[in-house]
Structure formats: structure tokens, C-alpha cells
């Protein structure tokens, strides 16, 4: 009788409760009291957001406004998102996900199942930004310690990360997702939504040792066109080397972002052309080219800021103990990667002018990226000329460029042939023992560098083609890329 009446006449549930009191095992869930009753309201056990799993099927949205008629009910407004904790006949005991955390009973007829929505309307959610960009945002003058944001995770597809400013640094926390769909920072602390997670850690911030005070203010100049940055944003930490354009340093941007900083003396630069040249360079994007981050051209010295590659330049790396242990497939892989980058520059009609192993950078995973493309054009004519002696890299430069300053994609091809020689000699200097003058003299007489001991014969054939006296007879980078890739494939097939 009881189950039948409770199911058919749910609107008299308060009356059935008087006739058939609830079992003690169910006292933790408040039941509806009638309008005429005046019970002493029970204090429902506080529902911690972390105490319940959050399967996606238990998310609801309020279809209509509902005003609670007693302490056990929960008032909701149309559009409110709720998480169902337990079904109670024609009611759902739910937790409201928007606004102050609260729980109570809501009639099922007032609700509809909802699907999780990306929190794009929240001021603390930043979509489409990376970890490095989050650091820039939070460390900007507009944001103080305690500023925070949530962003999509870079390492976990569909996941999130919490980034919080703590004085002069930014702390990042991965927000994990349990199989049930719950979110957590710490195991055992489960939350049905990002709102609930933030609400909990705003109160219990000591668990992550950083208070969550206010959402990040998105007014940092992170627009891609704003390349000019104040020099004060960069700290030079360790000198990595020195080349024709100045010194290269490992540095930190905004106190936490590792970067490479090329320091150039203004006396050697055509500063009037710098902005125009940077405008051209920043449009070049390829996985085999170093990414340009920023420039500092106001005052002296000029900074050109790029991404940092862990193993430094290719010439130095090849001469290291780790580099000397590399096998032929690795060396050929370097050649193929550089050819890919140069082929892209060729398609964009960009002339490098200073292609050499010292201007190719190596990552921790042995990826190669071409650097300093186009910068030689910024050097003053009296600096980058044969008469200036050591400033011009004669041993890497095509004869027509070294003698007459005729630079082209085909003069880059000549330099690529010299780079191949460096790769297959593990960083050895070309024309060793010769002066610049002697080098040019010998080249004009037909001398070409010999085949390195570990260099495959078919690769050396490509080197010699790169060193044709007539630029028109030299291959394009597109052809070099295809031929090197073909040699690489045959080598790997032979090894397997």
C-alpha cells in the first residue's frame, strides 16, 4: 500500500511521511514538509563539493523559476545549472553549480538534463592561450599576486590547468578529470564543475599555498603585432656564444619564460630598416624556423628575442662529446631538417645570407631550426663586406656574394653545401688552415672541399652541385630537400 500511494499521490508526501516515518538510514536526506507543518528545521549535513562524483548524465538545468516552500527545498532560477546528488521520487536532491554553493530538493518537472558547457562566459577562463602566454598575462602590471585563470591544458586534451600569480612567479596546477567526469587538483577532492572547484580552493587556498583573489585581467599587450618590448622585461643569465651579429644569451622573459636573446650593437645596424625587416620576418612561420618573440630596438644595445633551444647551435653541439657520438642517420636527419626550413624560405623568396651550422639551433629532442634568417640585411654595408675582414663569413659565402655582394637564394644554396660539410665532419671548420683571401683564391681556381670520411657518396654529389661556379647551375632547396629525404629513406631501409 505505502509504495503505491507514494508513487501515485506524490503531492501528499508530507501526509505519508506522518503515517509512515522515514527509516533512520534515510535521515541524511531531508524530506519535504507540508505548508501547514511547522517543524523545527533540521540542519542538513553540509555537502562538500568534493564529496560526490560528477557523472555527466547528472547535470541539470532549471526550466522555470522555483521558490522553496520550506527549508529542505532549494530555490532556483530559470537557467541555473544543478548537479543531482540523489533522486527522491518526483524530486531531486541537487547542488546548485552557479552562485553560492547550496543544496536542496527541486521538483523534477522544473528540470531538464543538461550537457556540460565550456566555461567561456567566466572571467577567469581563458581559451586558446598557452602556458607561456598565461605567465605573461599574470605577470603583467595589470595583475597582482592572487590573480588566477583557468586555461585548456597543453599536455592533456580536453583537460584544464589553473595558473596563479604568486609574487614574481606563476604557479601552474593541472586539473585532472576522473573517469566519472569529476574534476580534481588533489586525489580524493572531487568536484562536479570548475565553478565548484574554484569556490572550494578560494576558501581552502592553503591547500595549494596560493590564494585565489581575483580573475586575471586580460589587458596585457599580447597582440602579435606588438613586437617592441621594454628591455626591462628581459634578464640575461648566461652567454651562449658570439657571432657576426653580436652576442647570444640565455635569458628570462618576465622572470619565468626561457628565451634566447641576441644582443646587437646599434653601431652595426641599419636601425631605420629594422622595423620593416622585423615586419617581414614575423610573418615567417615554419616548424624548422626559430620563432621570433620580441625585439628591443629603443636605445642600445638592440635585443632580438627568440625561442630557446636546449642544445644550442649545431656547430658547437656536433663538436661536443654527445654530438660526436651521433651516427650517420642522425647527421642525415639534421641535413634534411635544415633543407626543409630553407625550402620554406625559398618559397617565400627570403634570402638568409648567413646560413651556417652556427645559425642552426638544436632542441633537446634533436630537432633543428634555422635562425638569423634575413638579419644580415640589417648590417651596414661597411660592416658586412670583404674589406671589413672578419665580419663577413667568407668561408660560408658564395663567391659572387663575397666579392660583389650579390646575394640570392642560390648563394644560400652554396652556403648549404658548406653546412653539409660541417655536419658530416662533426662541426669542423671549412677550409681549415686557409685565410679568407686564400679561400676565395682557391675557390676561383676550382678547388672544392673534399668528401668527409663519414659522408655518403650521394650526399657529397649534392655538396658539389651546391658549389657550382654559376649560380644558375646550383639546385634549388626544393630539389635538395627531396633528394636528401630520398637518401634518408634508403638509409633507413638499409638499416632495417
UniProtKB/Swiss-Prot annotation:
Disruption phenotype: No visible phenotype. GO terms for cellular component: cytoplasm. The modification Phosphotyrosine is found at residue 384. GO terms for molecular function: ATP binding; non-membrane spanning protein tyrosine kinase activity; protein tyrosine kinase activity. Residues 124-216 form the SH2 domain. It comes from the Eukaryota. ATP binds at residues 240-248, 262. Higher expression in liver, lung, thymus and skin than in brain, kidney, heart and spleen. In skin, highly expressed in keratinocytes. Abundant in lung, liver, spleen, kidney and testis and is also detected in the cerebrum. Residues 234-495 form the Protein kinase domain. Its main location: cytoplasm. The active site is at residue 354. Keywords: ATP-binding, Cytoplasm, Kinase, Nucleotide-binding, Phosphoprotein, SH2 domain, SH3 domain, Transferase, Tyrosine-protein kinase. It holds the Pfam family PK_Tyr_Ser-Thr. Belongs to the protein kinase superfamily. Tyr protein kinase family. SRC subfamily. Interacts (via the SH2 and SH3 domains) with DOK1. Interacts with KHDRBS1/SAM68 and VIM. This is Tyrosine-protein kinase Srms. The gene is Srms.
Amino acid at each position: 500500500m505505502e509504495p503505491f500511494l507514494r508513487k501515485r499521490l506524490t503531492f501528499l508526501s508530507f501526509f505519508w511521511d506522518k503515517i509512515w516515518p522515514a527509516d533512520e538510514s534515510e535521515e541524511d536526506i531531508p524530506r519535504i514538509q507540508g505548508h501547514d507543518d511547522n517543524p523545527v528545521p533540521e540542519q542538513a549535513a553540509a555537502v562538500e563539493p568534493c564529496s560526490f562524483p560528477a557523472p555527466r548524465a547528472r547535470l541539470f538545468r532549471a526550466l522555470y523559476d522555483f521558490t522553496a516552500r520550506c527549508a529542505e527545498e532549494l530555490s532556483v532560477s530559470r537557467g541555473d545549472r544543478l548537479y543531482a546528488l540523489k533522486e527522491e521520487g518526483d524530486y531531486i536532491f541537487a547542488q546548485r553549480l552557479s552562485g553560492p554553493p547550496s543544496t536542496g530538493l527541486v521538483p523534477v518537472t522544473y528540470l531538464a538534463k543538461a550537457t556540460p558547457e565550456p566555461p567561456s562566459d567566466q572571467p577567469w577562463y581563458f581559451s586558446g592561450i598557452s602556458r607561456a602566454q598565461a605567465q605573461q598575462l599574470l605577470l603583467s602590471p595589470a595583475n597582482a599576486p592572487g590573480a588566477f585563470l583557468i586555461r585548456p591544458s597543453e599536455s592533456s586534451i580536453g583537460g584544464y590547468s589553473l595558473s596563479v600569480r604568486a609574487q614574481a612567479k606563476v604557479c601552474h596546477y593541472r586539473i585532472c578529470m576522473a573517469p566519472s567526469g569529476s574534476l580534481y587538483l588533489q586525489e580524493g577532492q572531487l568536484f562536479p564543475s570548475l565553478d565548484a572547484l574554484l569556490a572550494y580552493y578560494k576558501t581552502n587556498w592553503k591547500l595549494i599555498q596560493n590564494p585565489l583573489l581575483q580573475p586575471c585581467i586580460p589587458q596585457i599587450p599580447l597582440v602579435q603585432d606588438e613586437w617592441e618590448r621594454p628591455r626591462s622585461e628581459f634578464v640575461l643569465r648566461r652567454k651562449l656564444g658570439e657571432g657576426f651579429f653580436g652576442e647570444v644569451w640565455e635569458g628570462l622573459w618576465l622572470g619565468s619564460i626561457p628565451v634566447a636573446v641576441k644582443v646587437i650593437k646599434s653601431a652595426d645596424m641599419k636601425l631605420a630598416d629594422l622595423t620593416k625587416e622585423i615586419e617581414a620576418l614575423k610573418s615567417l612561420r615554419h616548424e624548422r624556423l626559430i620563432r621570433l618573440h620580441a625585439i628591443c630596438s629603443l636605445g642600445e644595445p638592440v635585443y632580438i628575442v627568440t625561442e630557446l633551444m636546449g642544445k644550442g647551435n649545431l656547430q658547437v653541439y656536433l663538436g661536443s662529446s654527445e654530438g660526436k657520438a651521433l651516427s650517420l642517420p642522425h647527421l642525415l636527419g639534421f641535413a634534411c631538417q635544415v633543407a626543409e626550413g630553407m625550402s620554406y624560405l625559398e618559397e617565400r623568396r627570403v634570402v638568409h645570407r648567413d646560413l651556417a651550422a652556427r645559425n642552426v639551433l638544436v632542441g633537446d629532442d634533436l630537432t633543428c631550426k634555422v635562425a638569423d634568417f634575413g638579419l644580415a640585411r640589417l648590417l651596414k654595408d661597411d660592416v658586412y663586406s670583404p674589406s671589413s675582414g672578419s665580419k663577413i663569413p667568407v668561408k660560408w659565402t658564395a663567391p659572387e656574394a663575397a666579392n660583389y655582394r650579390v646575394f640570392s637564394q642560390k648563394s644560400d644554396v652554396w652556403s648549404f653545401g658548406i653546412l653539409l660539410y660541417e655536419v658530416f665532419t662533426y662541426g669542423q671548420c671549412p677550409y681549415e688552415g686557409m685565410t679568407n683571401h686564400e679561400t676565395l683564391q682557391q675557390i676561383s681556381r676550382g678547388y672544392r672541399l673534399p668528401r668527409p670520411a663519414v659522408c655518403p657518396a650521394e650526399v657529397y654529389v649534392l655538396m658539389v652541385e651546391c658549389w657550382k661556379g654559376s649560380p644558375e647551375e646550383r639546385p634549388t632547396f626544393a630539389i635538395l630537400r627531396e633528394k636528401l629525404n630520398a637518401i634518408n629513406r634508403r638509409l633507413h631501409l638499409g638499416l632495417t
